[in-house]
Amino acid sequence: SVYLATDERDEGRWIAGEIDRRRSEGTSYNNMAVFYRTNAQSRMLEDMLLRAGVPYRIVGGTRFFDRAEIRDVMAYLTLVVNPADDIAAKRVVNVPRRGIGKTTIERIDQYGREMNMPFLTAAELAVVDPDIRASTRNAVGEFIQVIKDGATYGGDLRKVVEMIIDKAGLIRALQDEGTDEARGRVENIQ
């Protein structure tokens, strides 16, 4: 079948509808496939399939929400809503690379354990720790500020996501890499 969609959402809805139609005609999910050219196209398609309750698996690629760059964005958003999420904080404290090394991360983690506080709160102590290099303290401070800005941002979710991506420098860092893979990751984030 050929269908001229008005946008990617319309395309995803149509595909999910076609799958549902064929399923109701007796076709097994195992006998259906959807091909797409770029990984960036899978996001909307996966979203529509999930909404329609259609089981799927990705062959030769990674599910959209399992991609590192998407998990990074999700970790930032998690911290905006729940700054006590240590797993999310440790995932993105140095994403993109901002000069916060393993030793500093371990030190922050140790502060948190010793003082029974979340990683992000402990990171605020690192900002004033004279035993940590000034450039690293500044980088930790910038990371904390991104999360605080996100938490106080009074816009709709799309604007919050855009602000976090911009302030964290996620797209800028990938654009600076200049590789085809990095360009694909930028498409995924956008």
Which role does the model predict for each range below?
Residues S1-Y36, G61, A89-K90, A123-I132, ...:
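Inter-lobe coupling/hinge region of RecA-like P-loop helicase motors
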Residues G53-R63:
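Conserved RecA-like helicase motor-core motifs
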